Amino acid sequence: MWGPNLGGFSDTQDATAEIQAIADQVKSQLEEKENKKFPVFKAVKFRSQVVAGMNYLIKVQVDEDDFVHIRVFESLPHENKPVALTSYQTNKVRHDELTYF
């Protein structure tokens, strides 16, 4: 069982249904920034970091051999704020390491 480290990112893990749901919440934000649609948007790996909320680094498959790394912030539940895409990197491949950016 993985566990995020306070202040640091967890080890890279296989994406779960929860991580896919988080990625899905920021898909439209990425599509708007990139001015394109992603018919495939499958979370495959992730890392997490506990802060005043949760940061996620998520590797998302957007085509057969094309990946995007997204950084997402999820605020604390009582703040009632939407999940936010805070940064992203395009032109990634499956074997690219998921590191902070």
UniProtKB/Swiss-Prot annotation:
GO terms for cellular component: cytosol. SMART domains: CY (SM00043). A motif (Secondary area of contact) lies at residues 49-53. CDD domains: CY. GO terms for molecular function: cysteine-type endopeptidase inhibitor activity. It is found in: Cytoplasm. InterPro entries: Cystatin_dom, Cystatin_sf, Prot_inh_cystat_CS, Prot_inh_stefin. The record marks G7 as: Reactive site. Keywords: Acetylation, Cytoplasm, Protease inhibitor, Thiol protease inhibitor. The modification N-acetylmethionine is found at M1. It holds the Pfam family Cystatin. Belongs to the cystatin family. Strong inhibitor of papain and cathepsin L but poor inhibitor of cathepsin B. This is Stefin-C. It comes from Bos taurus.
